[in-house]
Amino acid sequence: MECNLGTEHPSTDTWNRSKTEQAVVDAFDESLFGDVASDIGFETSLYSHAVKTAPSPPWVASPKILYQQLIRDLDFSEGPRLLSCLETWNEDLFSCFPINEDLYSDMMVLSPDPDDVISTVSTKDHVEMFNLTTRGSVRLPSPPKQPTGLPAYVQEVQDSFTVELRAREEAYTKLLVTYCKSIIRYLQGTAKRTTIGLNIQNPDQKAYTQLRQSILLRYYREVASLARLLYLHLYLTVTREFSWRLYASQSAHPDVFAALKFTWTERRQFTCAFHPVLCNHGIVLLEGKPLTASALREINYRRRELGLPLVRCGLVEENKSPLVQQPSFSVHLPRSVGFLTHHIKRKLDAYAVKHPQEPRHVRADHPYAKVVENRNYGSSIEAMILAPPSPSEILPGDPPRPPTCGFLTR
C-alpha cells in the first residue's frame, strides 16, 4: 500500500546510530533479561534461562496453595504485584490478543455442568511436565531494505507473533487443566469430610450433592483466579521475548522506518502490550489524528512497568523531554484487570458455547424468562469493564480492525 504524501523524505538526522543505541539503553532493563549480547542471533529466547518446564501441580491442594505453587512453577513472583497494578490502570492491554477459543472448546473441566466437571477426575492422570518455552514455526522476519517492503513486513511480524503465542498457549492450556483437576479433587475431599460421622442413610450421595454445590459456588471462581495469573504470565513472557528481539532488529534500520506511515485505527491497538512496529519514526496517526507526545509517553510508562521495550516515534518525541509519563487514573473508567478478565472469560466460556446445556433453571417470576447463570467467576466482569455502552462503542470482545500501514515516497 503506497501513500504518496509529498516529495520530501522525513529527516532522519536525529535518528543516527548513536541515538538509536542510546534509546536502547534508556528503554532496556538489563536486570530483567540478562545478557542480550548472548542472544544477538535472535534465535533463542531472552527468557530461555527463566522458565523451561513446569511440573504437574499437587494431586490435591487448596486453591490458596495451588496459587502459590503456580507462582513458583512459572517463576513469576512479580505476578501478584502486576495484577495489583492492573487494578489501578485504565488502559486496555489485552483485548487485541487472539482468544484462540478452539483450544478450550472441548475442555470438559470448563463445562457449566458440575457433573461433567466432576467426571474429569474419575480416572488417574499420568504425571506430565509442560514445556512452557515452545516456539512457533514462523521465524521473526528481518526488516526490509527498502520502504516498499514495509507493509508486507508489518503483516509478517504480526503473523509471526500470533503463531508464537498460539504455540505457547497450547502448553499453558494443559497446565490449566491439571490445576483445575487439583481444585476439583480438593473440593471432592472437602465434601467427603463433611459427611464423616453423620448418621445419614446415603453419605456418598450427600457428599456428591455438596460437591456439586461447591463446583457451582466456588470452583469457577478459583479457576478464574488461577487463569488470571497464568495468562498474564503467558502474555507478558511471549510479548517480552518477541518484542525485545523485534526492537533490536528494528533499531538497526532507522532510515527504513523513517519512511513508514502507520495508523492505529483503534485506541486499544495503541495501548496493546504488543506492537508490530517499535521504531515508528515516520508519520504516525491514532484514530486518524496525529499522535501526541504526551499519549506516547503515557503508553511507554506502562510498557516500562511491564518490562517491555518502549515504542519510539522520531517525529513525535520532544527534545529534552522524558520518554515516559505516568497516566492519570479514574475509578469511573474501565480497569486493565477488567479487560484481562473479560478476555480470559471468553476462553473459559468456549466449552459452553460449543456444548450448550439444556437450561435446568429459569426465572419463572418474570414474563421474559431467562436462564440463570450458574457459573460464578467472582467479580462482575461487566462492572469491571464498562457502563452500559452505546451500540456503536467498541467492546473488548469485538475483533480488532487491523492497523493501516504504508510508506512515504521521495
Curated annotation (Swiss-Prot):
GO terms for molecular function: DNA binding. Residues 388-410 are annotated as: Disordered. Associates with the VP16-induced complex; binding to host HCFC1 activates VP16 for association with the octamer motif-binding host protein POU2F1, to form a multiprotein-DNA complex responsible for activating transcription of the viral immediate early genes. Keywords: DNA-binding, Host nucleus, Host-virus interaction, Phosphoprotein, Transcription, Transcription regulation, Virion, Virion tegument. Transcriptional activator of immediate-early (IE) gene products (alpha genes). Acts as a key activator of lytic infection by initiating the lytic program through the assembly of the transcriptional regulatory VP16-induced complex composed of VP16 and two cellular factors, HCFC1 and POU2F1. VP16-induced complex represents a regulatory switch: when it is on, it promotes IE-gene expression and thus lytic infection, and when it is off, it limits IE-gene transcription favoring latent infection. May play a role in the aggregation of tegument proteins around nucleocapsids during virus morphogenesis. The keyword ATP-binding does not apply. It is found in: Virion tegument; Host nucleus. It comes from Varicella-zoster virus (strain Dumas) (HHV-3). This is Tegument protein VP16 homolog. One of its GO terms (cellular component) is viral tegument. Pfam families: Alpha_TIF. InterPro entries: Alpha_TIF, Alpha_TIF_sf. Belongs to the herpesviridae tegument protein VP16 protein family. GO terms for biological process: DNA-templated viral transcription; regulation of DNA-templated transcription. Gene3D superfamilies: Alpha trans-inducing (Alpha-TIF). Disulfide bonds: none annotated.
